[in-house]
C-alpha cells in the first residue's frame, strides 16, 4: 500500500468506529520507530511534521523524501500518509507542491471568514494533486509552533461552514490542549463533541492533543465520531525518559560502556527509539486501529 493520501482510511475509521493515529516525527530515528510500530500492528498511520520539525529536518522536501524513502527501504506494507501538522497557508501550499499526501491548514487564529476563505483555496489546490486536507475551527489549547490557544469549544456553525469548504476531516476544539495536561484540566467536553457529530453526520473529527488524555475519554470520543487522534508529546516524553535513564546508567558504568562503544549515537539513542515505538504501538491499541491496514 505504502504512501497514500489519508481521506479514505480516515473515513474508514469514522465509518467503522475506530481511530487512526497521527504521530509527529522529528528525525530519521523517530520516523523509523513510527513505521515499525505501524507495520507491527498492521495499522494505517499518518506520519506528521509540524512546521518547526520540518525546518529542523532540513525543510519540507527533505522531510517528505526521508519518510517516503524509509517506507520503501523498510518494506512497509501498511498505508502511510505524509501529513503536515498545523500548517500556515504558505506552508500548506509548499507541502502540496513537494509531495506531502495530506496537509492540515490551520487558520484557526484568523478571523472566521478568512479561515474559511483560505481553507477553500487550500482544498482546491490540494485536491487537484490528490492530497487530503484537514482544517481547524475552535482553537486547540496550548501552543503549537507559535499558534497559542486556550482550549475553546468549536462553534457548531463554524464547523459546518468549514466542512462545506470541501475538507476531508475536521479538527474541532472540544476542550483539548497541546502539550502536557495541567492537573486542573476539566477533561474533554463530550457533550459538545456529540453536538458536533450530530451536526456533521458521518464526518471524521480529529482530536488534537491526544497525549495525556485518559484512555477512556479517548475511546468515548472515538465512539462519538473522532476518527484521527494526534500524538506528539507522549512520544517525546517516552524518548526523553528512556534516553535519560541510559545516560544515567552510562555515567554509573562509564568504563564498561566506553569499552562497548555505547557512545555511538546509534546505540546511545536505541532505548529512546524503542520507547517511541512502544508508545506508538500502545496508542494504536487504544485507538482500535490494529489490523485495519
Language model segments and positions:
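Alpha/beta enzyme core
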Residues: 4-12, 16, 28-53, 60-77, ...
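Short catalytic/ligand-gating loop segments at beta-alpha or beta-beta junctions
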Residues: 207-212
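A hydrophobic, small-residue-rich beta->alpha segment in the mid-to-C-terminal subdomain
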Residues: 225-256
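Extended, intrinsically disordered, low-complexity segments
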Residues: 248-293
